[in-house]
C-alpha cells in the first residue's frame, strides 16, 4: 500500500497543483473520482492488463469510456499516466488528490461509530466540538455498531478516539494482564 501511494503521489500532486492554479479543484476531484471508478471496472482491468495493447491504445480506450466527462487537460493527464503504465494507480491518485483538496479547504471526513443511533442534534454537537478541536470543517459519517456496548469511536485521518465501553473493557483487561 505504501509503495502504491509513493508511486501515485507525483501524479496526484501535479493534478492538484494544476487544478488549484486554474481554480478547478471540484472538477478535477470529480474527474479523478470517475477515472478511479472506471479503472476498477472488471472489463477495464482486463484492458489495462492486456500485454498486446500499447499505452496509447489503453489511454484512448480509457478516454473513450469516460466520454465527454474529461476536458483536454484531463485527457492529457490520462495519456501521461498511461505512458508510464500507471493507469491502475488511478484510485490511489484520486484518494491522494482528495486528501490534498481537503487539506487546502481545511476540511476532514470523520467516521463516527456509535453503539446507538445518534440524532441530528447529537451529530451537530459532535461535529461542532470536533471542528473546534481539529480546527477544520468536519463532515461526519455516522455508523451504528451495537458491539461497542456504549459510547463512540471517532476516526479522523490518523486520529482515533475510542470512547466505547468495549474499548474501555479491552484497556482494563490489558491492565489486569500486566
UniProtKB/Swiss-Prot annotation:
It is found in: Cell inner membrane. GO terms for cellular component: plasma membrane; proton-transporting ATP synthase complex. It comes from the Bacteria. F(1)F(0) ATP synthase produces ATP from ADP in the presence of a proton or sodium gradient. F-type ATPases consist of two structural domains, F(1) containing the extramembraneous catalytic core and F(0) containing the membrane proton channel, linked together by a central stalk and a peripheral stalk. During catalysis, ATP synthesis in the catalytic domain of F(1) is coupled via a rotary mechanism of the central stalk subunits to proton translocation. Keywords: ATP synthesis, Cell inner membrane, Cell membrane, CF(1), Hydrogen ion transport, Ion transport, Membrane, Transport. This is ATP synthase subunit delta. PANTHER family: ATP SYNTHASE DELTA CHAIN. HAMAP family: ATP_synth_delta_bact. Belongs to the ATPase delta chain family. F-type ATPases have 2 components, F(1) - the catalytic core - and F(0) - the membrane proton channel. F(1) has five subunits: alpha(3), beta(3), gamma(1), delta(1), epsilon(1). F(0) has three main subunits: a(1), b(2) and c(10-14). The alpha and beta chains form an alternating ring which encloses part of the gamma chain. F(1) is attached to F(0) by a central stalk formed by the gamma and epsilon chains, while a peripheral stalk is formed by the delta and b chains. It comes from Pseudomonas fluorescens (strain Pf0-1). The keyword Membrane applies. It is a peripheral membrane protein. InterPro entries: ATP_synth_OSCP/delta_N_sf (IPR026015), ATPase_OSCP/dsu (IPR000711). Gene3D superfamilies: N-terminal domain of the delta subunit of the F1F0-ATP synthase. GO terms for molecular function: proton-transporting ATP synthase activity, rotational mechanism. The gene is atpH.
